[in-house]
Amino acid sequence: MNRRIVATIILIFSISVALAAKKGFTLVIDAGHGGHDAGALGSFSKEKNINLNVALAFGKPVESNCPNVKVVYTRKTDVFVPLHQRADIANRNKADLFVSIHTNALPKGARAVGLETYTLVMNRAAENFDVAKRENSVILVEKDYQQHYE
């Protein structure tokens, strides 16, 4: 059953990208965290490094196989990019799709299974606001963050 769900999701995503690629499409790939913001820390890895590797590995075949898809990265090296700049990159490039890559840490010996996908749902504003506050707490490590956010 799980394989059917995954196969269906991949098929739908592939068809969507293929149709969009015919018209011209801008995909912004955001490797979450970076620089002094390590993200989750594993016993032998940092989230920022995994995210960067996944983002580059995700973008490469799109660049190679979809000539009408413009791929834009928020970062290609281990640098810190403030959240407002990531949004500016997407807006400046008129992104059709913004994908932010993040990974989780696990306790030693635990096995990872599955994935998480987050999308904005407008009818649950209070709950969404709590999630947004938690997820965007990285803003507090930005230099002069008060100048960029309300």
Spans of model-derived segments:
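Positively charged n-region of N-terminal signal peptides that target proteins for export
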Residues: 1-5
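Sequence-pattern detector for short linear motifs
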Residues: 6-7, 89
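Bacterial N-terminal signal peptides
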Residues: 7-16
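Catalytic-core regions of hydrolytic enzymes
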Residues: 20-149
